[in-house]
């Protein structure tokens, strides 16, 4: 089970603003459960910037990604497909983790 989650720094503001409400992960990073609170850090520097609450975890195929998934990631569908292929090349089985931000203490929000 994951005890924390990381995101690339480029997604930090989208997460904090509520524009990004899902993350697509591989099976190894899908072991979270609804109601779980996770600290969130940047992938690059391991710098904490908020806590999230997991709402649900749903399996989804790369080939089944839709505009709705893209909107929840705050991207276009072509952007989302490109980003997923960069992170998980050739992977078809993904897991959608739907979340909300629950804590940003000590984080300066611009």
Swiss-Prot record:
Q: What Gene Ontology cellular component terms go with this record?
A: cytosol
Which ranges does the record mark as transmembrane? none
Q: Name one GO molecular function term.
A: hydrolase activity, acting on carbon-nitrogen (but not peptide) bonds, in linear amidines
Return the broad EC class: hydrolase
Give all residue intervals belonging to the ASCH domain.
Answer: 6-93
Q: Which UniProt keywords apply?
A: Hydrolase
What is the catalytic activity of this protein? N(4)-acetylcytidine + H2O = cytidine + acetate + H(+); N(4)-acetyl-2'-deoxycytidine + H2O = 2'-deoxycytidine + acetate + H(+); N(4)-acetylcytosine + H2O = cytosine + acetate + H(+)
Top-level lineage group: Bacteria
Q: Name one Pfam family in it.
A: ASCH
Active site, per annotation: 20, 23, 73
Q: What is its EC number?
A: 3.5.1.135
UniProt similarity note: Belongs to the N(4)-acetylcytidine amidohydrolase family.
Query: What does the protein in this record do?
Result: Catalyzes the hydrolysis of N(4)-acetylcytidine (ac4C).
| Official protein name in the record | N(4)-acetylcytidine amidohydrolase
